[in-house]
């Protein structure tokens, strides 16, 4: 089932943990609608801007899958409202900055950020269509969360070390 031009339900629900443990990771109708909203409002604009495929490293997670991986059952992933992503060839911090400045979102987290490796970690982003997106931006360095994205050096619209 296609959720949008470039994103399918299969890629938004794929989980090696679910496959290995025999966990049903099938979303309900409400979660599928939320995944579609996420695709149209966040992922399609992101793909169009960078003109590269967006890799979903974690999308929808059933409550059973959340429990299996140590995530909260109340996670926005369990509601179909969040994804973790990367774009091959684009530093994750650059992706995070673009998202912060160009789309409506609820929460944006630059996960496992290392200033010496702007391509490291991954980007977590969530969206819900209720109109009450918080626009919360955080950076997680593996130990603690901090508000906002880290300051970076830029040249020609790209992150430089």
Which residue stretches match the model-derived regions?
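Acidic, His- and aromatic-enriched active-site or binding-groove loops in soluble protein domains
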Residues: 73-93
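Structural recognition of the beta-strand scaffold that forms the well-ordered cores
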Residues: 55-57, 82-86, 124-126
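Extracytoplasmic cell-surface/polysaccharide-interacting catalytic and binding patches
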Residues: 1-49, 142-161
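Short, flexible, solvent-exposed loop/turn segments with mixed acidic/basic and small polar residues
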Residues: 68-78, 113-116
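A generic structural signal for short, non-catalytic loop/turn and secondary-structure boundary residues
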Residues: 49, 78, 118-120
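Extended, low-complexity, intrinsically disordered C-terminal regulatory tails
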Residues: 44-70
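Amphipathic alpha-helical interface surfaces
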Residues: 38-42, 65, 81, 91, ...
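Catalytic cores and adjacent binding grooves of peptidoglycan-active enzymes
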Residues: 87-161
């Amino acid at each position: 089932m296609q959720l949008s031009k470039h994103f399918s339900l299969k890629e938004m629900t794929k989980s090696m943990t679910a496959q290995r443990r025999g966990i049903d990771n099938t979303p309900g109708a409400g979660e599928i609608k939320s995944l579609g909203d996420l695709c149209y409002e966040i992922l399609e604009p992101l793909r169009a801007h960078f003109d590269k495929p967006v890799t979903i490293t974690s999308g929808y997670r059933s409550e059973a899958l959340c429990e299996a991986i140590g995530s909260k059952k109340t996670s926005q992933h369990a509601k179909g409202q969040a994804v973790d992503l990367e774009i091959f060839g684009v530093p994750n911090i650059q992706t995070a900055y673009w998202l912060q400045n160009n789309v409506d979102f609820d929460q944006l987290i630059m996960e496992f950020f290392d200033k010496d490796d702007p391509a490291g970690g991954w980007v977590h982003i969530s969206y819900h269509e209720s109109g009450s997106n918080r626009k919360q931006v955080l950076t997680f360095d593996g130990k603690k969360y901090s508000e906002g994205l880290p300051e970076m050096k830029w040249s020609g619209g790209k992150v430089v070390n």
